[in-house]
């Protein structure tokens, strides 16, 4: 197990023998259910605001299939939703997760719009954590029960959670591949090369 410091807290990662990795994420929760926003030319959109390591607005997508062929239209729709959510009282939300039915054996499929109009090719670890928080709050997923989240490409994460007070601690498991190697240089004269203590 490896402890990784992130800007929102410590997460732990476990490498499994089959090459998959499990990440126990930061405490996650749903902040608001059924948040309505008005979108020009579209009308009312209803979704949940949740924290899973990033702030998400999660909304069911009923008009478009969540597949790669629709990525430009999905990006534009999610961007408009984000602008409406930000303008109507939720400036902290910087990710939009459109979700629908699973198409490849999963419980659900998602399209996640990230800051800068980028989209996540994976099912999104923080987005899956936010989704688990909503499912837990609605009592639609029991503690320890598995949830299979598909990405727009059909790749999958398996998520589950345990309760910790008013929060859940989500664990997300998926495939991992080595894509690079880095070297850290620790200078003798750098007083902070080993970090800082508090």
Give the residues covered by each predicted segment.
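Active-site proximal loop and beta-alpha junction motif in alpha/beta enzyme cores
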Residues: 1-198
């Amino acid at each position: 197990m490896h402890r990784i410091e992130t800007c929102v807290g410590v997460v732990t990662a476990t490498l499994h023998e089959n090459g998959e990795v499990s990440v126990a994420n930061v405490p996650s929760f749903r902040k608001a259910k059924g948040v309505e926003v008005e979108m020009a030319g579209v009308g009312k959109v209803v979704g949940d605001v949740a924290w899973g390591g990033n702030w998400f607005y999660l909304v069911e997508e009923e008009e478009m299939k969540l597949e790669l062929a629709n990525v430009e239209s999905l990006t534009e729709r999610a961007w408009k939703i984000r602008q409406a959510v930000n303008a109507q009282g939720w400036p902290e939300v910087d990710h939009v997760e459109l979700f629908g039915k699973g198409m490849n054996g999963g419980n659900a499929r998602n399209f996640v719009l990230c800051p800068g109009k980028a989209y996540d090719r994976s099912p999104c670890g923080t987005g899956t954590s936010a989704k688990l928080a909503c499912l837990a709050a609605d009592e639609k997923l029991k503690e320890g029960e598995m949830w299979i989240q598909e990405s727009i490409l059909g790749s999958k994460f398996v998520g589950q959670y345990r309760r910790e007070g008013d929060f859940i601690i989500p664990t997300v498991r998926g495939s991992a591949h080595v894509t690079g190697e880095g070297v850290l240089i620790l200078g003798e004269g750098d007083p902070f090369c080993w970090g800082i203590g508090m």
